[in-house]
Amino acid sequence: MKTGRIVKSISGVYQVDVNGERFNTKPRGLFRKKKFSPVVGDIVEFEVQNINEGYIHQVFERENELKRPPVSNIDTLVIVMSAVEPNFSTQLLDRFLVIAHSYQLNARILVTKKDKTPIEKQFEINELLKIYENIGYETEFIGNDDDRKKIVEAWPAGLIVLSGQSGVGKSTFLNHYRPELNLETNDISKSLNRGKHTTRHVELFERQNGYIADTPGFSALDFDHIDKDEIKDYFLELNRYGETCKFRNCNHIKEPNCNVKHQLEIGNIAQFRYDHYLQLFNEISNRKVRY
């Protein structure tokens, strides 16, 4: 038996990496009976049948798992936003952050296309990123001339997953980092201000201290797994200040003696972050039940 990590999955064949050696594996029938499928990122134990082929016997317990796209055991989720084309959106960024925290993922923020951004807009984005840094996020704002290799190798060890809207430059970023990958990229649609999906599956690529993965771009975000009363926990500063609210289950909307509302009034919480919380709270409160 060998133990390795699934780095690629296409048509039911799972490519497993074992110290740089790749094996094409398939799961045993037991997984189908249990209606359980391995995903990219899984640590698996498999039996070698032929040269570089085998059958998966066991999938070890996952530390975490992103559902869309399916990838597991993520050490850091890098949320990639572009400054322009498509335009930087704190609302979209906050929604990605909520998704990340709902799956217990560590998140950091990468903003691209600085070289295409007017100076005034750069200043505006830098000011917004300072707010996120004060909340506790690591942020970077990069342009075409920035050294991607230096950036990636400075990131934490383990599995890094790039996630974000279509057209923000995830595949372009990886092509600069590893030109031999030659990943397909697309210009964004001028009419829709968003990109086409060029990455169609998740694949892990080796880096100095782990792996890095591109993921298919999102056209819509799914919050079906999140309850309205959980959302406050995924806005980190609301969660932090909410610990001293009068009521333990305070949703920071109309409740008396709410410390979050107090911190908002004195400027310790950004108004746009609180507004995005309210929007998402109302959206999830009013969603229709799916059967």
UniProtKB/Swiss-Prot annotation:
The keyword Acetylation does not apply. GO terms for cellular component: cytoplasm. Zn(2+) binds at residues 245, 250, 252, 258. Coiled coil: none annotated. GO terms for biological process: ribosomal small subunit biogenesis. It is found in: Cytoplasm. This is Small ribosomal subunit biogenesis GTPase RsgA. It comes from Staphylococcus aureus (strain COL). Its EC number is 3.6.1.-. One of its GO terms (molecular function) is GTP binding. Keywords: Cytoplasm, GTP-binding, Hydrolase, Metal-binding, Nucleotide-binding, Ribosome biogenesis, RNA-binding, rRNA-binding, Zinc. InterPro entries: G_CP_dom, NA-bd_OB-fold, P-loop_NTPase, Ribosome_biogen_GTPase_RsgA, RsgA_GTPase_dom, RsgA_N. Transmembrane segments: none annotated. It is an enzyme of class 3 (hydrolase). CDD domains: S1_YloQ_GTPase, YjeQ_EngC. Its main location: cytoplasm. Its cofactor is Zn(2+). Residues 63-221 form the CP-type G domain.
